Amino acid sequence: MFLGQEYRTRWGALDRRRMNAAAEAFFRDSWQLDINPRRLIRDLSLAERKLVQIARALIDGAAKLVVFDEPTAPLEAQEASLVSSAILRLREQGIGILYISHYLNEIAALCDRGTVLRNGEVVGYPDRALLQDTDALIKMMVGRDIEQLYTPRQSSAQQVDAAAPVLSVRHLSDGVHLNDITFDIQPGEIVGVAGLLGAGRDVLVDLLYGLRRARSGTISIDGQPKRLRTPYQATRAGMALVPRDRRHQGLILPFSTADNINLASLAETATFGWEHRGRALAKARSWIEQLSIRPGRPELPVRFMSGGNQQKAILARWLGTDARLFILDEPTLGVDIGARSDIYQRTRELADRGRGVLVSSSDAPELLGLCDRILVMWRGELVANLPTRGLTLDALLVTINGGQEQQV
């Protein structure tokens, strides 16, 4: 909290006692929180770490305006509520807030007025009343109605039910977190995986892509059993993964956008291990244009891009491959509504081309709008297999929260 603004004794040494007392008083007086200032950052929750960041900007009492850029993106709902409450108290203290977020419910709850940007230009200045109208706000942000967010399918997986499944999982277990998981994905089918935190969604994805070892069960691609002990083996078997943590699992942040896009198809842009830079840049430019990745500069380090454009760069990496199964793990986490629309459209196009798609997401409306079927997990087991036609959001949420098992 005091980095760069340390309290010191008259002899120049760090006055830790005074800094600890000031930090403790700040948390207590500003937010009515009891946080021990002597605790190590690594031992704090994500929400507490975020509060420390906020406190560092405010501890000297000089700040009149605080800019928050996606402050709750990595947080669970309860943690996000804690941070939002702290921000509201700042407003009550007369501090100006500039709040940047793609979470529309937070914008509606926290902000008095807004500014909407699309493709780098201002398209509107919604007042507080309009901020409460999610449908109107999404239309302003995306340029079309919310009903058009999930593009219609050109084909249906039901037409190819006689074909061998793209993915066939039988009695998959890891001995700890998952037990006896069995399901298929047909060519051209989008299958969602839903479940509460800790239900096993992330473990299932890791087992399928060779990030964890299965203790029992089989995984088959196009009817052929595969041993998937590493991501390399999974990729060779015809799988592609868009991971849940793009910054740590999906991107090489210092590398350019072009380098990240071409990672899965280096053979197309190199000869005997030597890269043809012009060929690599041309391939990247093609995908940048097709997916509307902004800014459209293939040489720009990917760390400077927004979360939505980073996610589209990872998706572009796999679209040019011959992968048969696409695993999308939290594909729109931390992604703005415009990028979401592009990702949904590309996902539907993959299915229309006969690829299988597995979408693991904590966003129930997303699964309902995007998928043909939804697998629901509960405490490491598959408890429901729900066709989305005719399925309501309320019924899905009841099942996710431990409701009645159906059609397993």
Describe the function of each predicted region.
Residues 1-408:
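Glycine-rich phosphate-binding loops of nucleotide-dependent enzymes
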